[in-house]
Amino acid sequence: RGKFVLQAHLCTVWQEGQYKRTREIGEVKASFEDLLTRLATDYIDIGMIHYVDSLEDWEAVAGGPVMAYAREMQAQGKIRYIGLSSHNPAAAMQAVQSGLIDVLMFSVNPCYDLQPANEDCYALWDGKNYDRQLVNMDPEREALYETCSRLGVAITVMKAFGGGDLLDEELSPAGKA
């Protein structure tokens, strides 16, 4: 087990054959215990609080039972590092600056980095957002990456290839694969 880094999400459940995002603490706890059982381990390295894209959601997570549970699991050694996943640099920045997370899972790629902050992650795929000339990194994203570096918050990347779009010349906002 010591040769692997396990990253797993809190706040996700599998119900009736479907993924569901949840902040209901009973579901969060049951899902996490089920995860440990299914992975046949007594701890995970990174407990990633799933999909926090709005400031309101971050405030609810940070000040509510989800963060309290994550910290409790960390104190018990069931989670080594607390993480958070987000597509929105504004919400992610709040989390990073709070000191409550050790790891940020963030959508990083050459096209998304040119997009401004948005609470709707589906806007990242909207073609009209790429109609304007994209020449500079979004300042909020640049500040987020610098802040993570300065505060020692690790970044784990999601959507490095934009869900595959960046590998397809016709789908890539850059017009090249």
Place the predicted regions along the sequence by residue.
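Beta-strand segments within the central parallel beta-sheet cores of soluble alpha/beta enzyme folds
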Residues: L6-A8, D45-M48, L84-S85
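Short loop/turn segments at strand-loop or loop-helix junctions that form parts
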Residues: H9-C11, I49-H50, A160
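Active-site groove signature of glycoside hydrolases
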Residues: D34-W58
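N-terminal binding-site loop/beta-alpha segment at the start of enzyme catalytic domains
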Residues: R1-A8, D42, A75
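Beta/alpha (TIM)-barrel catalytic core signal, keyed to glycine-rich beta->alpha loops juxtaposed to Asp/Glu
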Residues: V52-A177
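Active-site mouth loops of central-metabolism enzymes
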Residues: L10-K29, L55-E59, L167-S172
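Short, acidic/polar
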Residues: R23-A40, S86-Q94, K176
